[in-house]
Every structure is written in structure tokens, then in C-alpha cells.
């Protein structure tokens, strides 16, 4: 299993909105960055990810599961762009903020800390466990 971080502005698409989609989830569409697209192409069904609220909140608020492999993004006619399907798994009880993540020495190499603009990012197993611990998810899912 691999771990990821998905970023979204809560005013555009929040974790609450994803939860409303239920078990079917929804496509993580609108990504127009090659590195983020390639990250989605590497995903497997069952991979887990953090749902991160960007611009407002700046915190890890939920856990998502990849429930559909990379496929054409229906929001564009351009065949270069793909997306995966994700569904909400659970809320993070105590959402770690970006400042808290940056202050944690164990997370100093995390992509979120060093390339915070990338909208879909890999997360290492150790980073996953540490952010889960910070958020009150022990043991980590």
C-alpha cells in the first residue's frame, strides 16, 4: 500500500463534500500538473491518503481511500489529464496544521513541507504514521 496527500480548497471542495458522496466517492478531477497526474497514475485501489484543506484552514482534516484507478478526467477534452476516484474513510480527530507539520522534525522531508504547491503528493509510511499520531489516529489506519 502507498500513501498520498490530496489538497483542496474547502470553499471549492471540502472533506465534508467528499463525505456526502458516500461509498461511491468521486473523481479527483481538475488537476493540471504533470507531477500530480503522474502521482495519480501510480495509485492503486486501496491506497490511503490525507485530505488537506489548502488556502483556508491549512490542515489535514480527513483520510481518503483510492477507489478507482487513473482514468480520463471528464472535466477536459484533453487526453493528457487523468484523475483517480476517492472516497472518504474518516475524519482526523485533531487536524494537524501546516505549522505543526513544519515544526515536527520527523516530517522535515515531507513533500508538503518542501513543495507545498503540489496538489497530489506521495507520503512515506513513516510520515503517514507521524501525521496520524499528531491527528489522534493511533494506531494509524
Show which residues each predicted segment covers:
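A generic structural signal for short beta-strands and their flanking turns/coil linkers
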Residues: 2, 24-27, 45-47, 60-62, ...
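Aromatic- and Lys/Arg-enriched surface recognition patch
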Residues: 61-121
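Charged phosphate-binding loop/patch that engages nucleotide di/tri-phosphates or the phosphate backbone
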Residues: 123-141
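Short coil-to-beta transition motif at edge beta-strands of beta-rich domains
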Residues: 40-52
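Short, charged, solvent-exposed linker or helix-capping segments at domain edges/interfaces
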Residues: 17, 95-101, 131-134
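Short, acidic Gly/Pro/Ser/Thr-rich loop/turn segments
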Residues: 11-13, 93, 130
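Compositionally biased, charged N-terminal/linker segments
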Residues: 1-43, 138-141
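Short, charged beta-turn/beta-strand-edge "cap" motif at the junction between a beta-strand
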Residues: 52-58
Amino acid at each position: 500500500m502507498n500513501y498520498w496527500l490530496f489538497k483542496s480548497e474547502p470553499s471549492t471542495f471540502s472533506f465534508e463534500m467528499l463525505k456526502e458522496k458516500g461509498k461511491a466517492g468521486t473523481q479527483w478531477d481538475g488537476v493540471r500538473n504533470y507531477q500530480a497526474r503522474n502521482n495519480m497514475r501510480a495509485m492503486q485501489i486501496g491506497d490511503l491518503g490525507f485530505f488537506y484543506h489548502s488556502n483556508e484552514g491549512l490542515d489535514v482534516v480527513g483520510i481518503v481511500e483510492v477507489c478507482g484507478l487513473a482514468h480520463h478526467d471528464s472535466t477536459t477534452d484533453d487526453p493528457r489529464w487523468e484523475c483517480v476516484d476517492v472516497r472518504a474513510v474518516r475524519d482526523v480527530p485533531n487536524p494537524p496544521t501546516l505549522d505543526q507539520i513544519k515544526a515536527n522534525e520527523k516530517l522535515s522531508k515531507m513533500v508538503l513541507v518542501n513543495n507545498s504547491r503540489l496538489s497530489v503528493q506521495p507520503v512515506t509510511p513513516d510520515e503517514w504514521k507521524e501525521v496520524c499520531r499528531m491527528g489522534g489516529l493511533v494506531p494509524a489506519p
